[in-house]
From Swiss-Prot:
UniProt GO BP: sodium ion transport
Name by which UniProt lists this protein: Multidrug resistance protein NorM
Transmembrane portions of the chain: 11-31, 53-73, 93-113, 126-146, 159-179, 189-209, 242-262, 276-296, 315-335, 356-376, 391-411, 417-437
Family: Belongs to the multi antimicrobial extrusion (MATE) (TC 2.A.66.1) family.
Record has Ion transport as a keyword: yes
UniProt lineage: Bacteria, Pseudomonadati, Pseudomonadota, Gammaproteobacteria, Vibrionales
Cell compartment(s), UniProt: Cell inner membrane
Pfam families: MatE (PF01554)
Task of the protein: Multidrug efflux pump that functions as a Na(+)/drug antiporter.
Keyword ATP-binding annotated: no
Keywords, sorted A to Z: Antiport, Cell inner membrane, Cell membrane, Ion transport, Membrane, Sodium, Sodium transport, Transmembrane, Transmembrane helix, Transport
Length: 456
């Protein structure tokens, strides 16, 4: 029991800065939504649709680079910090390379919106937002590379501080470019994209300054020796990161595709859907931060060749995450009207958003289990298991269920947005079950097999 309490303390110390950093980053989306909503419902809806295209694209790149966290954590646990600079420099190369196709995908926004029959005015604003924010792609991915370094070394506070600075900068920059203050043009929802691009470049430069000047990273000597790009290293990183990226892509696109499918239902439905999605993303930061901390702790324990420590870290992560999820689910149900009022004063939007917030409360517990179990499996570098199971859960179970219930009369009369949210519940709950079973299976293997996964 003492080891569990000690592990819980270590986990919370790691997870708290990750949580604050993640909330700050997601809070930027909240600020975008609220400020765009202050212009018009169409601007608010445009930001929602733009996020549905931007997030899956950029998060695929982030997923590739997330593989660096357990790599760094295991090297740190094994006392091999001298190997860390090579891995991070190769990660920076990967970040720049993957920026090219991501920007290429973002350039296809007009085609995507045309295919989805989105309203012309909303489409114009959405395209403007995407064209502005695509300039942030390299900065966003390079920031993630450096964050993989600090997080992997169990230094989660730097990203927290910089994330909070980014949020504080995003508010006045949005104010300037959305409403046309201090001589800036009044761009409406497009101004949110301009502000976001500026903020991400500032955040990258701040983290770069930290890792090159902090006395806590002197032993790492990140840029003392230049390591040229190596094809084998790039292939290895890609193979390790691709399943994580694909799994993250599957989950995010489950929400993003639904937002695009909901778009033709009108601005009111889109706005209510965006309220529920944005708040759900804020709440999701709790279990996601615990999952990230669990990944770090599992990786560190495996670096020390302690499979028992890795098992305890996994169990503690799930217990802590499930406890917080029960609490947030209850608060969501009780305060759903007040939550909706934070986003808009449109009563029609509020009424529909309150209904959708009930669905967010329902799946919070299973969502916590799936994201923390995935974090533990990342610590083991059991990436393929995450890939396979999330694909089945999100694309073969969740999305088809949502589509059938939301837009067809095959089972019941078309339920609209509510049907898609039932699909979310099915997908996330299925992922929780499958990933939880996989983690339990891994824990039952002997030490040699578990450490063999670690060595992959």
């Amino acid at each position: 029991m003492h080891r569990y309490k000690k592990e819980a303390s270590n986990l919370i110390k790691l997870a708290t800065p990750v949580l604050i950093a993640s909330v700050a980053q997601t809070g930027m989306g909240f600020v975008d939504t609220v400020m765009a909503g202050g212009v018009s419902a169409t601007d608010m809806a445009a930001v929602s649709v733009a996020a549905s295209i931007w997030l899956p694209s950029i998060l695929f790149g982030i997923g590739l680079l997330m593989a660096l966290v357990p790599v760094v954590a295991q090297l740190n646990g094994a006392g091999k910090r001298e190997q860390v600079p090579f891995e991070i420099q190769q990660g920076a190369v990967m970040a720049l390379l993957i920026s090219i196709p991501i920007i290429g995908v973002l350039f296809q926004t007009q085609w995507i919106l045309g295919y989805m029959n989105v309203d012309a005015v909303m489409a114009t604003k959405t395209i403007g937002y995407i064209h502005a924010v695509m300039f942030a792609v390299p900065a966003f991915l390079l920031f993630q590379t450096l964050r993989s370094l600090t997080d992997g070394l169990s230094l989660t506070k730097p990203a927290m501080v910089i994330g909070f600075i980014g949020l504080l900068l995003n508010i006045p920059l949005n104010w300037m470019f959305v409403y046309g203050k201090l001589g800036a043009p009044a761009l409406g929802g497009v101004g949110c994209g301009v502000a976001t691009a500026i903020v991400y470049w500032i955040m990258f430069l701040l983290l770069l300054f930290y890792v090159t000047t902090s006395h806590r990273l002197r032993q790492v000597q990140l840029f003392t020796t230049f390591h040229p790009p190596q094809l084998n290293a790039q292939v290895k990183l890609f193979k390790l990161g691709f399943p994580v990226a694909a799994a993250l892509f599957f989950e995010v696109t489950l929400f993003a595709v639904v937002a695009l499918l909901v778009a033709p239902l009108g601005s009111t439905v889109v706005a209510a859907h965006q309220v529920a999605i944005n708040f759900s993303s804020l709440v999701f930061m709790l279990p996601m931060s615990i999952g990230a901390a669990t990944s770090i702790r599992v990786g560190h324990m495996l670096g020390e060749k302690s499979t028992e420590g890795a098992r305890i870290a996994s169990h503690v992560g799930i217990l802590v995450g499930l406890s917080t999820a029960v609490f947030t689910a209850l608060l969501t149900v009780i305060l759903r009207e007040q939550i909706a009022l934070l986003y808009t004063d449109n009563r029609v939007v509020i009424t529909l958003a309150m209904q959708l917030l009930i669905f967010t409360a329902i799946y919070q517990c299973t969502d916590a289990i799936q994201v923390i179990a995935a974090g533990a499996l990342r610590g083991y570098k059991d990436m393929r298991a995450i890939f396979n199971r999330t694909f089945i859960a999100y694309w073969l179970l969740g999305l088809p269920t949502g589509y059938v219930l939301g837009l067809t009369d095959w089972i019941v009369e078309p339920m609209g947005a509510q049907g898609f949210w039932i699909g979310f519940i099915v997908g996330l709950s299925s992922a929780a079950a499958m990933l939880g079973v996989r983690l339990h299976w891994l824990h039952r293997q002997n030490d040699e097999i578990q450490l063999n996964y670690e060595a992959r």
